[in-house]
């Protein structure tokens, strides 16, 4: 079925493939080669509007100037001492989302949002405290990556869907964005991580696409009781069922799963918790990523001591579970894991 482009508000051009952009320019009465030019200006030269594309005639630029590419505006930008940058991006409808650029010597990672706000309301996370507005469209996800790439003036190498929102409650647009980021920006699927708190049947559905992305499951607890306290939706999705679905995912995709585990002092950080967690991890390809808690003002959780963090990690390692400790970047800019919310810092 041929996609129609009759009105300026119908389809932002960002996210469309070369073939679709070629179709679009032909529908506007232009030769097919203009499609490649448009593609290059959108994905490689960072055009914010069609009026920016100087290889097009002035007359045609004026005729198509109201058709949206689909770019956001940087509403606010804050930089942490470790060079991590947090962006508040203003969307076309006025909503604000957060994106984080995390540079190292060899990498530039972008932490992207998949929703405006988050409906999951995890007890330790700032994003859920602000409520939920809507899903992001695919072009609004792609735009976040382009924004960071242009601001840093270097190529993005890795993408993590660990910003605002639950990606598997917006699977259609997240997968469309992943395909475009892979095909149009040249970012390998294995360098893209999709994080989820665990939505019944969605991990199984994701497995059917047989993507080479990394799946990160936010577990955060070693048993059902603790998990229900941290993640309200866990009441409707028993831990045993979630682990079973994760095992099925690994079997189908042949890809290792990463389990994210936020360490909260005197709540889920004891060696007994580690041993209980290990029982769930045996028998399939997985890795546990420990995240020392990053404080937010709304709750009273505390970060464990360095000694407790290492003790927990060692307890997992003794059970032959692959484990690492992730010390979040951007803490001073409120850009670390669990701190994202659409507000200035």
UniProtKB/Swiss-Prot annotation:
Task: Identify which cofactors the protein needs according to its UniProt entry.
Answer: [4Fe-4S] cluster
Q: What else is known?
A: Reaction proceeds by a ping-pong mechanism involving intermediate methylation of a conserved cysteine residue.
> Which is one Gene Ontology cellular component term of this protein?
cytoplasm
Q: What is its biological role?
A: Specifically methylates position 2 of adenine 2503 in 23S rRNA and position 2 of adenine 37 in tRNAs.
PANTHER family linked to this entry: 23S RRNA METHYLTRANSFERASE (PTHR30544), RADICAL SAM CORE DOMAIN-CONTAINING PROTEIN (PTHR30544:SF5)
User: Which InterPro entries does the record cross-reference, listed alphabetically?
Assistant: Aldolase_TIM (IPR013785), Methyltransferase_A (IPR040072), RlmN_N (IPR048641), RNA_MTrfase_RlmN (IPR027492), rRNA_lsu_MTrfase_RlmN/Cfr (IPR004383), rSAM (IPR007197)
Q: If you read the UniProt record, what top EC class would you report for this enzyme, in one word?
A: transferase
Subcellular location, in the record's words? Cytoplasm
Question: What UniProt keywords are attached to this protein's entry?
Answer: 4Fe-4S, Cytoplasm, Disulfide bond, Iron, Iron-sulfur, Metal-binding, Methyltransferase, rRNA processing, S-adenosyl-L-methionine, Transferase, tRNA processing
Active site location: 98, 337
Co-factor remark: Binds 1 [4Fe-4S] cluster. The cluster is coordinated with 3 cysteines and an exchangeable S-adenosyl-L-methionine.
Quote the EC number: 2.1.1.192
Q: Name one GO biological process term.
A: tRNA methylation
Disulphide bridges in this chain?
111-337
Source species taxonomy: Bacteria, Bacillati, Cyanobacteriota, Cyanophyceae, Oscillatoriophycideae
One GO molecular-function entry: tRNA binding
Q: What is this protein called?
A: Probable dual-specificity RNA methyltransferase RlmN
Keyword DNA repair listed: no
CDD domains the record matches: Radical_SAM
- Kindly list the positions annotated as binding [4Fe-4S] cluster: 118, 122, 125
Q: Which Pfam families match?
A: Radical_SAM (PF04055), RlmN_N (PF21016)
Q: Where does S-adenosyl-L-methionine bind?
A: 165-166, 195, 218-220, 294
**Positions of the Radical SAM core domain:** 104-332
């Amino acid at each position: 079925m041929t996609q129609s482009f009759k009105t300026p508000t119908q389809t932002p051009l960002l996210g469309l493939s070369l073939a679709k952009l070629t179709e679009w320019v032909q529908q506007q009465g232009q030769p097919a080669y203009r499609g490649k030019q448009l593609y290059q200006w959108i994905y490689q030269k960072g055009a914010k509007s069609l009026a920016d594309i100087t290889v097009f005639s002035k007359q045609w630029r004026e005729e198509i100037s109201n058709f949206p590419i689909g770019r956001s505006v940087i509403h606010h930008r804050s930089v942490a001492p470790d060079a991590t940058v947090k962006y508040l991006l203003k969307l076309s409808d006025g909503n604000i989302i957060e994106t984080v650029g995390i540079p190292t010597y060899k990498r530039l990672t972008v932490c992207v949002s998949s929703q405006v706000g988050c409906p999951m309301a995890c007890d330790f996370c700032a994003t859920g405290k602000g409520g939920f507005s809507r899903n992001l469209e695919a072009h609004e996800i792609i735009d976040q990556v382009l924004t960071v790439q242009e601001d840093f003036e270097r190529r993005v190498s890795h993408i993590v869907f660990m910003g605002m929102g639950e990606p598997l409650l917006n699977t259609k647009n997240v997968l469309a964005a992943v395909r475009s980021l892979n095909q149009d920006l040249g970012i390998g699927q294995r360098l893209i991580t999709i994080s989820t708190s665990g939505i019944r049947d969605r991990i199984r559905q994701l497995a059917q696409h047989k993507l080479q992305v990394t799946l990160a499951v936010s577990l955060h607890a070693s048993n059902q009781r603790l998990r229900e306290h941290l993640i309200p939706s866990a009441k409707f999705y028993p831990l045993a069922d979630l682990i079973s679905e994760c095992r099925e995912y690994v079997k189908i995709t042949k890809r290792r799963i990463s389990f994210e585990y936020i360490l909260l002092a005197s709540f889920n950080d004891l060696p007994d918790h580690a041993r209980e967690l290990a029982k769930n991890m045996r028998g399939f390809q997985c890795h546990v990523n420990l995240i020392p808690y990053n404080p937010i003002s709304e709750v009273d959780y505390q970060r464990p001591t360095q000694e407790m963090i290492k003790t927990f990690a060692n307890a997992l390692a003794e059970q032959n579970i692959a484990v690492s400790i992730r010390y979040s970047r951007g803490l001073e800019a409120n850009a670390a894991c669990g701190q994202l919310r659409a507000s200035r810092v």
